[in-house]
Amino acid sequence: MFEQNLTSEALTVTTVTSQDQITQKPLRDSVKASLKNYLAQLNGQEVSELYELVLAEVEQPLLDTIMQYTRGNQTRAATMMGINRGTLRKKLKKYGMN
């Protein structure tokens, strides 16, 4: 049986500069830069539920993309994500994607 060995390095963000230069960097670098920017804009204000905010920003497009890729097959989507189907259904409902 074929075993797929993908690492997080496969998740990259590609950008094209005004000089048509193409760059790729790991998704985690973009997330880190976005968080630093967000925190810099707080100007000392207290923030709560940052963890949930970040998860929602990543989780919703992940679910949407995987559901499109699997053509709505929840069993296959759950397997791809490494979660059980019940958990997937709860997450889809949370984001109004059921």
From Swiss-Prot:
The keyword Transcription applies. Residues 74-93 bind DNA. It comes from the Bacteria. This is DNA-binding protein Fis. Homodimer. InterPro entries: Fis_DNA-bd, Homeodomain-like_sf, HTH_Fis, Trans_regulatory_Fis. HAMAP family: DNA_binding_Fis (MF_00166). Keywords: Activator, DNA-binding, Transcription, Transcription regulation. One of its GO terms (molecular function) is DNA-binding transcription factor activity. Activates ribosomal RNA transcription. Plays a direct role in upstream activation of rRNA promoters. Belongs to the transcriptional regulatory Fis family. PANTHER family: DNA-BINDING PROTEIN FIS (PTHR47918:SF1).
